[in-house]
């Protein structure tokens, strides 16, 4: 008897989280690209922050996919933080 209630709860949580991600989508040219890029990130807030910074500085270029492919955008690939590691997710 409890299993259908658990299934309904899980499905409603999945739908709610999907709607939340869509509602927080940025309307700038970088918003959609960074939402895709950061869709599998563990820390989406941090990923979106740095992706948007890099995207704007690199003339709205964001590599395709959720990881890698940085050769598509050399500016995005070459941007470093103060520690010398890649700034852009």
UniProtKB/Swiss-Prot annotation:
Pfam families: GASA. Its main location: secreted. Keywords: Disulfide bond, Gibberellin signaling pathway, Secreted, Signal. InterPro entries: GASA. It is found in: Secreted. One of its GO terms (cellular component) is plant-type cell wall. Residues 1-25 form the signal peptide. Expressed in vasculature of rosette leaves and roots, cotyledon and root tips and developing seeds. GO terms for biological process: gibberellic acid mediated signaling pathway. It comes from the Eukaryota. PANTHER family: EXTENSIN, PROLINE-RICH PROTEIN (PTHR23201), GIBBERELLIN-REGULATED PROTEIN 10 (PTHR23201:SF141). Belongs to the GASA family. Gibberellin-regulated protein that may function in hormonal controlled steps of development such as seed germination, flowering and seed maturation. This is Gibberellin-regulated protein 10. It comes from Arabidopsis thaliana. The gene is GASA10.
């Amino acid at each position: 008897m409890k299993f259908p209630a658990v299934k309904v709860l899980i499905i409603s949580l999945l739908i709610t989280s999907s709607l939340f991600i869509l509602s927080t989508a940025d309307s700038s040219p970088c918003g959609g690209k960074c939402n895709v890029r950061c869709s599998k990130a563990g820390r989406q807030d941090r990923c979106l922050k740095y992706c948007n910074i890099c995207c704007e500085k690199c003339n709205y270029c964001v590599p395709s996919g959720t990881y890698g492919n940085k050769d598509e955008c050399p500016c995005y690939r070459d941007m470093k933080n103060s520690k010398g590691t890649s700034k852009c997710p």
